[in-house]
Every structure is written in structure tokens, then in C-alpha cells.
Amino acid sequence: MHDINFNILKDRAMDVDPDIRFMALEDLRKFLQDESAASTRTTLNQSLENFFPILLNMLNDQNPDVQTQAIKSFEPMVKYLSNETFSKLVKKLFALVQQNSSSTGNVTGMKSFTVSVPNIALRSLFAQSNSRDKSEFVSDKLSNSNYRFDPHLARYIMDYLIPQIVGNPVTIDSIELLIDLVTEIGYVLTQDELLNLSLYLTKVALTETGLIGKKSMVALERVVALVRTEVVIDKLLAQINQSIEPTKLFVIFQLYSVCLKRGIKPNSIDTIYNTITSNLNIEATEEEDDDDLDFDNLVKENSLKDEALTTLIDLVSQHFLPVESKNTVIALIKSYVNYNPLAQDEDFIDDEEDDISFSDDEQEDDGDGENDGSWKLRAKATILTRALLKSFPDTLELLSKEVLPVFSFADSNDQVVSEVIKSSIAIVNSTSPRDSTNVSELFPIIAARMKLAKETQVPLFLKLVESLNRFDNTSLVLEVFKIIKDRKLITSGSFDYLQFYSSTLKFHDNLPPLVIERMSSDFIKNLDDKSFNMITDSIKCLSLLFHQDSLEKLDAIVDLLIYKVENSKQYPSDLVRQSIIALGEAYGRADKQKILNVFKHSIEYEGTSKTTIDVLTQIYSTDIPSEYSYLILKKLSTSIMSSTEATSVASLLLMNKIFERLPSGDYDDTAGNLVQLLAVTNKANYECIFHILIKLVGTVLQETHRAPLLQTIVKLVNEGKIEVADNSFFQFITTACNQIPDLYNFFEDGLNLNSELSAKILAICASQNKLENKIMERREEFQNYYNSNINDSRLAFDILFLGYVGTHIEVKELDVQTLIGLLSNSQLTNDDNISAASTALGLIAQKHIDSAVPIILNAYESSEKTIIRGSLVDSLSIAADACNEDQKRVIWDKVFNFPVEFDHEVITELKKSGELLGKIPVVDELTINTDNLKTTYLILVITKSLLNNLQATKVNNTLLDSLIKSSIEWLNIVNIDIRQIVVGNLLTGLHSKPDTILPILDSIILPKIFDQLQAEDSFKKIITMGPYKYVLDEGLEIRKLCYEFIYSVISLENAVIKKYNINLEKIASKIIEVGLIDTQTDITVLACINLTNYIELHKDSAVELITRDGGNAFTTMINNLKKQLSKKLSAKASTQDSESHQERIKSIIKLSKKFASVVEAAESIELAAAIRVWNEYNNDLKTNFTIYYNSTDGV
């Protein structure tokens, strides 16, 4: 938009024609909302200030549209005004507000209860910003006028307005303005100022009535929300407690609730609790006869009790209720859940007696005949039940036995019934299916009530029945359906009933015919509903319905589903896909040919192809005609080449299933596409592809496809994409050998002969085709190297080749004793040859397991060299796959109990031993208490293996819990290797077995991790190099692992962090205190990375952290970062040192840039000193490290 001429704007704004005045303001608003206006910001400030008098005058415009437009004109201009100009505008508007309040009061003699026009305009200036990102309105979040006030300006405004608001008579204008001020810029108020403001608002609430009193309570809620200390809450409550009078109790309870909901536990809980309970005594009321009741007094008493119960709910919900008061609260609940002092008899709430007609104003109680408000007390008592159960789960039994049976299910008030059902559901959901006695008493109550309940209440009772589906409630379900039938309720087309059906079907495998009949009829109607959502949700339920035994209307339902698929253009794609899934569920019981015909067509369309393939994979069996399979295969031959990975994989799975049942044949197109796919597909799909290729071996190895396939295989093998354990691949190689006699020669020429994989391939080829000459060549080579140079690099391949050949035929040159002798030869130093020999020994041992294992174990026990024992353990790991339980126990006993002195030299051996034992664990010996470091380390390695591989069962989880808790204590052992594996296991467990780690994370694990963050002298070694001495910090790797663990903790989802009460502020504090002063550059970088991650994921927590204790953590962080930046690079620094130095600076700058947003959000007077230091630090950072600062991304 072009610039605006303010001289013309003024003339138009003062025109006699209201339409012109309106358009002038509209043009101004559009101009201010245009981003290009920012380019004229310097001059715009003055122009807008000059326009103020006219705009202020227009607030009194006689035309309401112009007046409204004038009000709207203030908010967009805020971001273009200087602090000085904005302050002037606030003063002018506030003067108009005061003038309006004064004139209104003088004329009427009463306080106005409407907000003045100037006040609306003034408040619009603050509706900008700090709360906008939390607003429920999208327009707020996207607003171009979103603007954050400068803290100094916010402070000035508060200092100007708050004294005048507090120092003058209270009005609706002043209270409404105060609410907005506190909400938007209240962050600048100190705790003392918040206390004073709270005391003022408390006084207003206690002295004012009507709207002003209510609004003062709203303002107090906003103020208390900013309170961060117990001191303020306690002082505020002290004033409230001093004001307790019988006439003020109604407001007192509301004030209590405001303080309690802040979540900071006060010292005066007993006083609050006693005040509440002393006003909830109903004995006196019960003793009076109905004729003696003062109705007006009763209404007042009930209203006060309503507030008392509300406050008690808040107290209990915040977990502030003293434990010893639980039973008293339960007694109160029992007293009030059926409280009705005007009841004539026990059946006062029967619908038949509700014969009094009320006006609309009298209907609020919806059931209390005299409108005494007692229904609110019954509802609140019921809500209190849920709050108590949540805070004290151990009250479940009492609530189930004493409260649940007396709930007012038949209450004449709908709100009470709703709350009763919610609380009943809470009790039922907390009850174990093993303890169903108490909840089963609900069955007859529900059945009886559903016969008489209003039709609108029936869905509420169905929710309660749903919660009982976890128990054996088939009799109740049947009774409910009988009632529905007898009452002739319309249940089709209702999401409430559909949800009930879904839950019932989910928990009951064999429902009575009456139930299934009713459900089926409704499903048939729902499938023709006008709402696509109703149809889709109904179809999802059909998958459960089709598993029921009694289902007479199956064919009718299937026909409707078929219609949906055949006429797919009439319906949303998700609805059609759900129909296909449901047809798959019905396939086993319906007309199979009809369903197969539908799938034959739906597989052709892109929107339904993937779903159809998935369903066909589930239902495919031998009874599907071969002709149909051929048709589907033709489609799959194309879809396996889909650019969509999911479709390609699904097609492969179905194709594999079909080929398992089809006879051999000519599948040339399929074979060609599979060969192409093999070259480009994901590694995870190899197994399925080779399974299919085995079935197509006759076709795929014909001249057309042979060369591309074998070349692809060679490429995949040489690139390491095939694994030694890929059984389907080697099955294909074995099958292919029967088709191609010279396959050995092809692979020998193409494969990299330095890998175990190549050795295994060639061994299979040689064995399958009985190529004795090839085997003899390798035997002779082995003998030659064995006798001349056992460290020749070519020996490894020969050993592996003969080892794999030895799994098929006897190779006399390579028996168990020979391989053990080779491994024991002190001259064998080539690592590849050692590895090859241990692998071959394991392979040979598998074939002769009974004789080989004792020989290997004997060699293991007699060897004095750790490298030899480690190699023999590798062999046993391979052989163990063929061992029986007795043999595994022998291996365990020998290896686990082998005596060896624990030091760093045997770590590799112990790792191998632990990995072996992890495959064959003896649980009893894992849970022993030991001081032996070797045993400790072995258990830790075994634990790591179990964390990665153990299936989650109750027994296994108990074992892991025990192992983890034991290992945490081992962090006290001063040994680098042990500490490293303990922290590594905790990290592994956090990812693979979080249910084991998370419950003890904050209370047990993190304190131990924090202990490891400090560099320890016991892990430091002094190394002398010429005239210089260097300190080697061997504990560095432990600290690195700890920071990796902390990073994973910080990255947990917020729901997990909240569930397990993980204290993020404490974690961040430890990093600031310890990590940012670590002498090792790597740790400084990791500390910065962790803090940056913390800010990105948990900004609110970071704000909370730096505002605590007067900003101590904030100040510590600044000082520690300064210390890091003050470190200079040595003149003799190496290239690596220079790179580390640069990385440290960049990480600090990135953290500082990220931290700026936290500082901005936390700005307050209390942090003023720390923020000044921060600004100085930030300026120095930009000045001293300009190049790094400009090149480092802080977003």
C-alpha cells in the first residue's frame, strides 16, 4: 500500500459526513497493518502523535460505527510509536477514563457497571502480545500487530497506572484495565508488588458486591498466577484469614480457591481446611422439620456450602489435603451425595413426582422442586469423590464400598446424574478386574435406572456400562439391550450408541443373539446414513462384529460394503479403504467369490491398491483359485516397482505368499522386475525378494535375467549390503547352484575375496556342485600358509572357506584340534586370521557339538593369554546356537566363574564373554551380590545384552529392574571401564526398555549421573614428554556418555517428563554449574549442546529456572560462559587444538543466541541486575567474536 497523507487524513476524519470519517479511519487501519509501513517508522511516530487529538475526540463521535472504528485504530499503531509517545497516549486515554468515571458517578450517584469507550481503547493497547501465543484464537496467534512491550516501557506504565488505579475509588473500568495490565505486562512486577496488589484486590473482593466484586476475583487470579514464592501466598492468606466473618465466608472461600489453585502449598492448610469443614455441618439442618425450615436461609446456607465444597475440591486436587483427613472427607461426601433437605421421602427424585412447572428462570436447578440449590451440593460432593481418588488412590476400596452404592443415580437433576456417572467411571477405571465385587453391585442399579431415565440420559449410562466392559458384565449388556428394545429407543445414526457397540464388541467375544441382532440392524442403517463420518466409524466397528459367533445379517452387511467399494467415486477414499478392510474381516464367513471379485477391481486403483494388497495378504490361502492368483500376480508384478515404498513392500509380501502356493511356471515379467527391484530397494526387503526368487529360480536364471541378477548380487555382496546371517539369500545361492554348475567361477572372479561373506558363498557353491578340485586348491593353500606363514593375509579367506565347507563335508586339515592349535600359536598375530580361525572353529564345533565343546572349554581354561581366551569365546558364541540346555549350563559355569585378574587388558575378553553369556543367561547367578570386579563387569555386559534382546515379560522385567538397580550402585566403584558400561547400559535401557529406567530416573539414576559430571583426580594421569608434563583426563569418556544420557532425558516427550516427575530445572542447573566450567573442550561443547536442546524443547522451564532465587542460575551461567571465552589458544596449539577452540566458541555463541529468547521472556525488575550483566556479556560476545557470531546460527 502507498504512503498515507496525514493532512488529508485529518481533514477526512473531521468531515461532517460519518461515512467519510469512517473510511478515513479504515484507510489508517489498513495502512498500519501493511508491513511496508515499517519503512516510514521514524516519521510515522510523529504523524501518529499529531493525529492523537482528533482520534481521541472521535471516541465521542455520535455515529456508533465511527466510534467503533476509532477504538479499533489504536491497537495497530502501537508498534510504530516510540516509548515516549506511547506513554503520552496511555496518559491521555487514562485521563479520559477517569473523567468518564467521575462524570458517571456524579450524574447517577452510583458506580457504573459498563466499561467506558476510552477504557476499551486504552485496553486495546495492551491486547498485543505476551499472552497472545497462548490464546485460543488463531487470529491472535497470526496477528501482524503482535508486539512485545519493552520491559522499561512496561515498568513505566505500571508505575504510572497502578498507583492511580489503587489510589482511587474502584470502578469497573479500573478493574478491567488492571486485569489486562497484569495479564499482558505483569511480568515486570516484583513479588512484593504482586503481594500488595493481591492484598488490594482481596480488600476489593471483600467490600464490593456485584460485577466489580466478581471482576476483582478475576484480577486476583491473574496476579496470583505470577506469584512464585510461598511467602507471598502465606501473607495473602494471613490477610484473608484475618477477615473471616460469617457474612464474608462466601467470598473467603473464593479467595481460598484462587490461592490454592496457584499450586504453591501454604502453611495455613489446617486453617483453610477447618474453615471449610466447619461450614459443611448438615446435622442441624437434618434435625429440623420441613415446616420449620426458613427457605431463604436454606438457600443462603446451600450457596455457602457450595463454595465451601468448591474450595475443598481445589484443596484436594492440589494434593494439599492432610493424609489424616481422608476419612473425614469421605464422610462429608457420603453426607452430601444425596443431600436434599426439602425431600418429603426417599423417592423425592422420582420422575413421576416432578409435577411442578417452572419458568425458564426457575429451571436452573433442573430438579430441586423448591430451587434451594441443594443439587449443586450433590454435584460438588460427587466431583469431590474424583478429586479424592486421584490424590489418594488408596481410598479406592472405601469409595467403592461406601460411596459408590449411595450415589444419586436417580437424581432429578441432569447435572448431578452426569457427575455421578463420571465419578462412578473413575472408580470403575481404577478397579482391577480381579476386584470386581464392589463394582458388580452397579449392575442392578444401572439396569433399574435405565428403565426410567430420560432418553437424553441413556448415553451417559452407556458410558458407565462401557467402563464395566473390562469385567464380566455380559448379563448387564444383555439387560441394557432388552431395555433399549422395550423402550423402543432410536439407536441408529447415533455416535453415542456406536461407541457403546464398539466397546462392547471389543471386550466380548460371544455376545447373545439379541445383542448381535440389534447391533447388526443399526449397522445396516448406519451404512446408508447421510453422514460419511457415521458410515466410516460404523465400518470400523464391523471388523469386531464379524468375529462374533451369531451373525445372521452378514450377507446384507457385506453387500452394502461391496456397494461402497464398487461405487468408490461417491465416497471419501478413507471410507472405501475401511470397507475393503471390513470385507477382509468378513471373508472367512461370507460369499468368498463376491469379495474376491471386488478385490480384483479395487487392486487396480491407486487409492485402494495398497489396502487391497494388505487385505489379500491376510486372507490368502490355498482355497483361492489359481486363475485368480495369476490375475493378482500380474498386478503385483507392476506394483512391486511402485515409487511408494509401502506399496512396494506390501506387494512383495503378497507375492511371496502367492508363490508359496502356486506351482512352478513361466513368470518372465515378474522375474525381470524383481531383478530390477533388487538393485535399488531397501536392504530390509532382500529376504522377501530372495524367497520369491527361489520359487522363480527356473525363470530368473534363464539367459535373459541371469547376468543382471548375478551382477547385482556381486555388487550387493561387495558393498556389504548382504549379511552372513541372511538365510534366504544363501538358500537362493544353494538352489541356484543346482541350475548353474559354473556359478563358483563367476563368483570367484567377481567377488571381493577378503570377506567372510564371499567365503561362505564360494563354500556353498563348491559343496553343492561337489567341486572337489576347488576345495582341494583351498586345502593346499591352507596347508602352505599354515606351514610357512600363518600371518599371511590370504590365509583368512582359506580358513573361512574351509570352515563353511566343513559344515557340509569333513575337512581333515581343519578339525577342532588344528584350529585350537592355530589360535594358541604365539606367532599368530594377524587379527583377520585370528578372527577367521575362531569363526571356523565355531562352525566346525556346531557339526560335532558333543565332542567339540569340551575340547574348546578345556583349551579356554588352560590358556593364560587373554587374546586366545577371547578367540575361543567367539567360537563358543557360534557353537552355542547348536547346544542343548545342559551344554549351555556347562559353558556358563566355565566362563562365568573363570578366575582372571580384572584390569584394562582383559576388557575385550570380558566383553566377548559377557556377550556369549547374554545368549545363555543363568538368572540365579546374575542377581548375586559381589565385590569381585571381574564378575561385576561380566554381569554388566550380560545386562547390556539382555537390555537389547530380552523380550518384555513380567519375569524378565523384574530381572532387568534388579540388574539396573544393582548396576547404579556400581557407579561408586572407581574404575573407568565399569563406570563406562554402567552409563552405557542406562542409555541403552532408556531407549530400549524405558519402563525399567523411567520410574527410578529422577530419584535414583540422575543423582548418580550428576556425580559423574565432575572431573575426578583419581582418573587423571600425569604424562611426562620431555621437559613438559601433561594431564591425561581418562574420565573424559565417562562424562561424555553422561551428557549423551542427559541429552536423551531432555529429549523425552513432555507427557513422559510430567508422568515421571523429571526435574528439568535441576538437570539444567547441574550442567550450568559443572559442565560450563569443565576444563575439557569436548565437555564444554556437550554442555552447550544440552542447554541449547533444553531451551528449544522446554523454554518455559528455562524461564522458570533463571527467575528462581533472584536469578542465581542465570548469573552463574553468564560467569561460567565468560570464563570459557577468556581461555586463550596457545601459540604452540596444534591444528586439532585450534579446531576444538573454534568449536567451543561456536557452541557458546549458539547457546547465547538461543538463550536470548529466554532472557526476553523472563525480564523483570528482580532480574534487572542480572540482565544488565547479560547485555554486557552479549555485547562483548558480538564485539570480540564478530566473525564467529555472524557465522553461527542461533535459530
Swiss-Prot record:
SUPFAM superfamilies: ARM repeat
Keyword Repeat found: yes
Function: Key assembly factor of SCF (SKP1-CUL1-F-box protein) E3 ubiquitin ligase complexes that promotes the exchange of the substrate-recognition F-box subunit in SCF complexes, thereby playing a key role in the cellular repertoire of SCF complexes. Acts as a F-box protein exchange factor.
Protein's recorded name: Cullin-associated NEDD8-dissociated protein 1
PROSITE patterns: HEAT_REPEAT (PS50077)
Any one GO cellular component localisation term in the record: nucleus
A Pfam short name: TIP120
Intrachain disulfide bonds: none
Summary of the knockout phenotype: No visible phenotype. Cells lacking both RUB1 and CAND1 show defects in morphological, growth and protein degradation, consistent with a reduction in SCF ubiquitin ligase activity.
InterPro entries: ARM-like, ARM-type_fold, CAND1/CAND2, HEAT, HEAT_type_2, TATA-bd_TIP120
Key words, A-Z: Repeat, Ubl conjugation pathway
HEAT repeat positions: 1-37, 45-83, 168-206, 397-434, 436-474, 703-742, 846-885, 999-1037
Presence of keyword Repeat: yes
GO terms under biological process: protein ubiquitination; SCF complex assembly; SCF-dependent proteasomal ubiquitin-dependent protein catabolic process
Matching PANTHER family: TIP120
Organism placement in taxonomy: Eukaryota, Fungi, Dikarya, Ascomycota, Saccharomycotina
Stated family: Belongs to the CAND family.
